[in-house]
Amino acid sequence: MPVAKLIQKTKSGVKPTTLALATILLVACAGGVEPPKPADLGPNVSLLGVKLAWTSQTGPVTFPLLAKAAGTTVAVAGGDGLVALLDARTGQDIWRTQIGNPVSAGVGSDGRYVAVITQANDVVTLEAGREIWRQKMPASSFTAPLVAGARVFVLSADRSVTAFDAASGRRLWAQSRPGEPLVLRQAGLLVAVGDTLVAGLSGRLVGMNPANGSSRWEVPIAVPRGTNDVERLVDLVANVNRQDDQLCVRAYQAAVGCVNTGRGTSLWVKPANGAQGLSGDDRFVYGTEIDGKVLAWKRVDGERAWESDRLKYRGLTAPLAVGRSIAIGDNTGTVHLLSREDGSPLNRLTTDGSAVVAAPLLVGETLVVVTRNGGIFGFRPE
C-alpha cells in the first residue's frame, strides 16, 4: 500500500510519522483487500535501440536520492555514507569516499564540490573526494543540497533555507518562515534559475536573492485546504522542468503548474494527483500520477495532450524527456521508454530487479539509472 512519509514539526525540531495517503486505502488494507495488480505488459517492442554501456555500484539507497550531473560527471551516494563521483562516459570512479555517517539527502554537485546531508543533520561537502567541511543543521533535510555559484544551499524540513560558502563552509545567511506542521519525507524543490534561487516552501514557489536570501517573488501552486494537518499538507517536490525562464513544478497530490521566473508570475496551474516531479520539452510537460498514469500537458496552457494507463500500479519515478522518448523507472527496476507523442511503448530496459529510486538522468549521451540496491546503470543509444 502506498504511504506518505511525513515529518511533523515540533518546537524541538522535526519528528517522523507515517500516514496513509487516503482513508480509503487504510480501510481497504484493514479489510484484507489486495492492492491493484499491474497489467501484464506483454513482449517488449524494441522500437528504439538502446544498449547497456556500463554498470557500477554504491551502497543500498535508503533516502530520497537525486543523482546530479555536472559536465560529463554524475554524483551519487548510498545510504551507508558512500559518496562517489563517476565519469558518465565510462562508469569509472573519478573518486569515491566514505563520510562516516548515513546519508539522509543528496546529492548536490557542480562538478567540483559535492554535498550531502547526513542523518545526524550535518551538511558535508567534499572536493576531489576529500571532506573539506561539515556544518550542523538545526533540523533534518530530505532535499539534496544545491551547489551553485560557489555556494551550498540547504532546504531543511522546517522549511528554512541556508547558504554556505562552498570552499570554507562559512554560513552566509539563513531564512525561515512559518509553515504547515507536516512536511514530506521526500526531496523538495531547490534549484537555480539564472541569478535567482528558487525554493518550494509549502505550496509556494519562492524566488530568492542568492546573496542574502531575500524574497524577490512568490507564486502559489497549491493552497492548504482541509480540516486537519494531513489534508492541509502541501509541498512542492523535486524534479522540475525548465525551458528558458519558464519553470514547471508539481505540488504533491494537488497540482502541476508553470511559472515565469523572470516576472515571478503564474502561467497556469492544473489539478493533478501525483507525488513525483516533472520533465518536459518545448511542447509538453510530462508527469506520472499516484496510480501510475503517465500524462502530458501542453506547455502553452496546461491542457491535457495525452495520457497512458499502460504502467498503472508500477510505482513510477518522475519521467525524463530524452531524445524522442520519455524514460520512467518503476518498482521492479525496469526503465520504460515511451513516445513523447502519445505515450506508446518504444522499449524496456532492465536493471537489477530492485526499484528505480530516482528519475533517470541524462549525462551527455548516457542515460543513468540508480536502483534501491545501489546499482548504477549507464545506457546509450545503439
Regions of interest found by a model, annotated:
Residues 26-28:
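C-terminal motif of bacterial Sec signal peptides marking the signal peptidase cleavage site
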Residues 32-68, 95-111, 132-148, 171-194, ...:
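Extracytoplasmic beta-rich repeat domains
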Residues 78-79, 118-119, 156-157, 200-202, ...:
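Structural signature of WD-repeat beta-propellers
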Residues 87-90, 127-130, 165-168, 210-212, ...:
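Short loop/turn segments that connect beta-strands within beta-propeller blades
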Residues 288-296, 303-337:
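Loop/turn-rich, solvent-exposed surfaces of beta-rich toroidal or solenoidal domains
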Residues 351-382:
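Blade-level signature of beta-propeller repeat domains, shared across WD40, Kelch, NHL, RCC1
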